[in-house]
């Protein structure tokens, strides 16, 4: 709850939703505009679910290099297992090998559901001197039908079966 309140203070709902829609949900632009990290913006995007002012219903997941899930949020459906790891064909895992790049992917699950995914490697803001600097991959996604609203999803077609 404390994290939600902090995010709401840093990225107030109405201005953030308007900016998200105007930028095509461009996470880097939103991070710069609101003075937040890529991960904070991705998390905030999952909270834009007010009945009178909804954003794209995103899910967000954060994994480490071993595939351990350390964060999982969704404003709508969440297409992946609640327990255990994630499919290695999902480019979420590739993001760790390509820091600084935002990767996109259209994925198709075994049941035929199609999703659009954005993945990026992120680091912690502050790490004590001498400590290892952990890197995580953050995945942000939505049902494929919403991909046209995203700057990343315009023209996305090629599918990768995952699951």
Locate each region found by the language model.
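Conserved binding/catalytic microenvironments
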Residues: 1-163
């Amino acid at each position: 709850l404390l994290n939600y309140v902090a995010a709401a203070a840093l990225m107030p709902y109405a201005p953030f939703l308007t900016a998200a829609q105007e930028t095509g949900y461009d996470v880097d632009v939103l991070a710069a505009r609101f003075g937040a990290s890529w991960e904070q913006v991705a998390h905030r995007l999952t909270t834009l679910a007010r009945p009178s002012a909804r954003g794209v219903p995103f899910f967000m997941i954060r994994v480490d290099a071993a595939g351990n899930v350390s964060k999982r949020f969704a404003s709508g459906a969440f297409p992946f297992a609640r327990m255990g790891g994630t499919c290695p064909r999902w480019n979420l895992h590739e993001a760790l090998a390509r820091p600084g790049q935002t990767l996109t992917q259209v994925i198709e699950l075994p049941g035929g559901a199609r999703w659009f995914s954005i993945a990026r490697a992120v680091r912690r803001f502050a790490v004590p001197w001498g400590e290892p600097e952990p890197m995580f991959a953050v995945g942000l996604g939505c049902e494929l039908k919403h991909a046209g609203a995203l700057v990343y999803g315009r023209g996305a077609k090629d599918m990768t079966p995952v699951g």
